[in-house]
């Protein structure tokens, strides 16, 4: 088996104030597309997280361009890895009847994209 060194560029965006489930729903649409198609798709998706993912993928493209090959185009690159992991949770409480307090969990996530 070949032990080639593959050229990759990775970006991690941390502590985004969006739930992991909502981000994963968008990432499932985008995986395994060429960069041009993925960015075009993200531009027109009506979700809140699509703008953050758009910026992350575009940043990984510029990282690849600066580090490996300056003349590369969007059509030649593909998204090899795109994942969302849960981040720290902000815990708040909401007052309820009889002096009780119910917890509110404000979830955050980390996005990793690799081309």
From Swiss-Prot:
Principal localisation: plastid
Keyword RNA-binding on entry: yes
Family: Belongs to the universal ribosomal protein uL22 family.
Name of the protein: Large ribosomal subunit protein uL22c
Keyword terms: Plastid, Ribonucleoprotein, Ribosomal protein, RNA-binding, rRNA-binding
Binding partners and assembly: Part of the 50S ribosomal subunit.
Domain of life the protein comes from: Eukaryota
Location relative to the cell: Plastid
Gene Ontology, cellular component aspect: large ribosomal subunit; plastid
UniProt function note: This protein binds specifically to 23S rRNA. The globular domain of the protein is located near the polypeptide exit tunnel on the outside of the subunit, while an extended beta-hairpin is found that lines the wall of the exit tunnel in the center of the 70S ribosome.
Organism of derivation: Euglena longa (Euglenophycean alga)
């Amino acid at each position: 088996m070949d032990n080639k060194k593959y050229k990759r560029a990775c970006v991690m965006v941390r502590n985004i104030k969006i739930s992991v489930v909502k981000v994963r729903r968008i990432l499932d649409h985008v995986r395994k597309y060429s960069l041009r198609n993925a960015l075009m798709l993200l531009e027109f998706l009506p979700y809140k997280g699509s703008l953050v993912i758009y910026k992350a993928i575009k940043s990984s493209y510029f990282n690849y361009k600066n580090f490996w090959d300056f003349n590369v185009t969007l059509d030649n690159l593909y998204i090899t890895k795109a994942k969302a992991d849960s981040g720290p949770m902000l815990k708040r409480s909401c007052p309820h009847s009889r002096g009780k307090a119910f917890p509110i969990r404000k979830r955050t996530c980390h996005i990793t994209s690799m081309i």
